[in-house]
Design a protein with these regions (language model features):
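N-terminal glycine-rich phosphate/pyrophosphate-binding loop and immediately adjacent elements
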Residues: 2-136, 140, 144, 309-330, ...
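Residue-level detector of alpha-helix initiation sites
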Residues: 10-11, 295, 509
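Glycine-rich loop(s) and the adjacent beta-strand/alpha-helix scaffold that form part
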Residues: 22, 26-52, 245, 254, ...
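Short, glycine/acidic-rich hinge or "gate" loops at secondary-structure transitions
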Residues: 38-40, 153-166, 458-466
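Conserved redox-cofactor binding core of oxidoreductases
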Residues: 53, 57-84, 95-98, 102, ...
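FAD cofactor-binding and catalytic pocket of flavoenzymes
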Residues: 80-105, 110-112, 131, 135, ...
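A glycine-rich dinucleotide-binding beta-alpha-beta segment and adjacent secondary-structure elements
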Residues: 89-90, 202, 219-220, 257-260, ...
């Protein structure tokens, strides 16, 4: 029997496990665990990769051209390449339906952060106002995670929104487009700040110097496909590190169905189903730690109550950041060369301070280098040949600002369980008040569009898209931490009320959802909870 039975190998699970192992205790980690494929030609740039692969069309676009992004009402300029298909592969045992919510889930080794873009921002006291612990209780664990994963950052105007208390590495070199925008901001800061908008360098979990087995970024331009040098952090790298501890056991290929409870409500283990054989298999532990991601952990919790009581409750308070995508063009860069061999994701970030933490806005600005051509070309008002020619001229001038609004727990947004006709447990997600923040959203759109114009970029109104709920991939709030003694909530240490030795270490336990990207905080909070789990 393991001392700690951890479910899930994503950002929360691996950092909880590493903290426990470092103090000499045993951990068994259960996982579906789909694996990342090996990266071909790991030293080649993206351009060299296209030239040297035997079949670049299939290897890069996929055997069925699944990497091609086709035009649609809201077409993102980035798709997920075949090398990332393992991240979104789902076992047959998983079932989900939703209303007003279009989520992504992952059963990969490393979870959804295997496909993240590395944004890593510390929360401030405003962000934690709804949480039952203080910023001072979280900050030491940011330092631990930063030391483990490596984060490139620079002190700038964004420190008013996100502290820099952890140890950070030197920032990545800027691409020319991002450098031009940041330089324009430095000259016109007062005008931009008057709109409530502040710009700075994006803080990214990318190495600018070697760390353990991982190498520093050398600007190969292969970030979208998966960094072959492991410069861009992924939780699967920490999972690999866990295997060095004698007290660690990793069990992939199992789907956790429910938590096992004794007559006193004490968690004693879990019931799983083996993916290969389909047989049920029990695992026991002194405590059970839900770290499968907010949605999967919610399904396990609800399935447990369905089995124990014959019915499962609704879990109100499902949260997801409002996500806005704002393409722009910087006219002075038309005709310039495109820097394909560079870091492909965001180099810049932005912040807006609202009247309360729930009104704050956080964003990241990307100069498009590795974007998909098809959705952009198809939107131009010319024939295809002319559109391609125009795109070639303006490509170096294109960029995109993605920004997010904070979210709060509200009763209309729920997770619940449905037992299907074939006795499967299906997670049902409903986001019932999608219009609650449209006023704040429109204010942010107007301010950010004006700010971009001040620094020389034009963001056409017709191209700005308010994306469907679920697009942010920041899900939280179904089993919130609170000081209130209520059912289906957690204490500050992640322990679930009404049960013993059951812990939630992922976003399901978040009390509110700040605008900032939460992966860094998920890891730091998991470390905090692990320290509290004695």
């Amino acid at each position: 029997m393991a001392r700690h039975l951890v479910i899930g190998s994503g950002a929360s699970g691996v950092h909880y496990a590493l903290t426990i192992l470092e103090r000499g205790e045993e951990v068994t980690l259960l996982d579906v665990g789909y694996e990342r494929p090996a990266a071909p030609l790991p030293d080649a740039t993206y351009t060299q990769l296209k030239e040297q692969l035997a079949d670049p069309l299939s290897d890069i676009l996929g055997e069925r051209s699944e990497y091609v992004v086709y035009p649609g009402p809201v077409s993102k300029p980035y798709g997920f390449p075949p090398s990332k298909s393992y991240v979104f592969r789902q076992p047959a045992a998983w079932s989900l339906t939703s209303r007003g919510f279009d989520p992504l889930v992952s059963f990969a080794r490393g979870g959804l952060a295997e496909a993240w873009t590395g944004g890593s921002y510390e929360l401030d006291e405003r962000d934690l106002a709804a949480f039952p612990f203080s910023l001072g209780e979280l900050q030491p664990h940011y330092a631990t995670v930063a030391r483990r994963i490596g984060i490139a950052a620079e002190r700038d105007d964004l420190e008013r929104f996100s502290p820099m208390t952890a140890g950070y590495d030197a920032p990545l070199p800027l691409d020319a487009h991002s450098a031009q925008l940041l330089g324009a901001y430095a000259r016109k800061r007062q005008r931009v700040n008057a709109l409530g908008v502040y710009l700075g360098r994006s803080r990214v979990a990318v190495l600018t110097k070697p760390l353990g087995e991982r190498a520093e970024c050398t600007q190969l331009g292969r970030c979208l496909m998966g960094c072959p040098r492991e410069s861009l952090y992924a939780p699967s790298y920490t999972l690999r590190q866990l295997h060095r501890f004698p007290g660690f056991a990793y069990v992939p290929g199992v789907f956790v169905e429910r938590i096992l409870l004794d007559g006193d409500g004490r968690a004693t283990g879990v019931m799983t189903r083996e993916l290969a054989a389909g047989a049920e298999k029990r695992f026991t532990g002194d405590r059970v730690v839900l770290a499968a991601g907010a949605l999967a952990s919610s399904r396990i919790y609800l399935s447990t109550l369905q089995h124990e009581n014959g019915a499962a409750p609704e879990l109100p308070g499902l949260m997801d950041n409002r996500h806005v995508m704002m393409p722009f063009v910087t006219p002075s860069r038309v005709g310039h060369d495109v820097e394909i061999a560079s870091y492909q994701f965001h180099h810049l970030a932005l912040g807006m301070r609202g009247n309360s933490a729930g009104d704050d806005v956080h964003g990241q600005i990307t100069a498009l280098k590795g974007a998909q051509v098809h959705p952009i070309v198809s939107s131009l008002p010319f024939d295809f040949r002319t559109s391609l020619s125009v795109f070639g001229r303006v490509r170096a001038a294109l960029g995109i600002a993605n920004f997010w609004l904070a979210d709060t727990r509200r009763a209309a947004n729920v997770a619940e369980l449905r037992v299907t006709d074939d006795a499967r447990h299906q997670l049902v997600l409903s986001y019932g008040d999608d219009r609650s923040d449209l006023g704040r959203t429109n204010q942010a759109i107007a301010a950010i569009r004006k700010s971009l114009r001040i620094i020389g970029a034009i963001a056409p109104k017709s191209q700005t898209a308010v994306l469907p709920r679920g697009s942010s991939v920041h899900y939280a709030g179904t089993l919130p931490m609170t000081n209130d003694e209520r059912k289906h909530t957690c204490r500050a240490d992640g322990s679930v009320r009404g049960f013993e030795r059951l812990i939630v270490a992922d976003g399901a336990a978040f009390s509110s959802l700040p605008a900032k990207n939460i992966t860094f905080t998920l890891m730091a909070n998991a470390v905090r909870i692990a320290h509290a789990s004695q």
